Swiss-Prot record:
This is Small ribosomal subunit protein uS8c. Keywords: Chloroplast, Plastid, Ribonucleoprotein, Ribosomal protein, RNA-binding, rRNA-binding. It is found in: Plastid, Chloroplast. One of the primary rRNA binding proteins, it binds directly to 16S rRNA central domain where it helps coordinate assembly of the platform of the 30S subunit. One of its GO terms (molecular function) is rRNA binding. InterPro entries: Ribosomal_uS8, Ribosomal_uS8_CS, Ribosomal_uS8_sf. One of its GO terms (cellular component) is ribosome. The keyword Chloroplast applies. It comes from Euglena gracilis. Coiled coil: none annotated. One of its GO terms (biological process) is translation. It holds the Pfam family Ribosomal_S8. Part of the 30S ribosomal subunit.
Length: 140
């Protein structure tokens, strides 16, 4: 059975959809991807998301459920609110940081998403709660 990195898959799907200025993108439904979508919506990077009824039967007979993420654009030229997404901690090389060493992204415009003992949270929330964790990705 193939093991995929759902975070990298999600970020790549969003990145590719932004390149073609798509309005929505389907991402594999896991607790982790739903929590990431909630953070992105709360911080204003995406418009909304919903649990899709669509399922897909893979070659192995596994049923995959998806969530639909609605991307957010501004102006008549349809400029995305997301400029760049950078994956930091990968399955082959995990990256951890204490709350004291967390740096602001893009001069405070962007954010860092962390996996902590209290769940997923942004760098600002981690600093205020004095919790460190695994740095999943940067977004600005």
């Amino acid at each position: 059975m193939t093991n995929i990195d759902v975070i990298s898959d999600m970020l790549t799907r969003i990145r590719n959809s932004l390149l073609i200025k798509a309005r929505k993108v389907n991402v594999i439904n896991t607790k982790l991807t739903v929590n990431i979508a909630e953070i992105l919506k709360k911080e204003g990077f995406i418009d909304s998301f919903e649990l899709a009824d669509a399922t897909c039967l893979t070659e192995n007979g596994v049923i995959k459920k998806y969530i639909t993420i609605f991307l957010k654009y501004k102006g008549p030229k349809q400029v995305s609110y997301i400029t760049k997404i950078k994956r930091v901690s990968k399955p082959g090389l995990r990256t951890y940081s204490s709350y004291k060493r967390l740096q602001s992204v893009a001069g405070g415009v962007g954010l860092t998403v962390l996996s902590t003992s209290k769940g997923l949270m942004t760098d600002r929330l981690a600093r205020s709660n004095k919790i460190g964790g695994e740095i999943l990705f940067y977004i600005w």
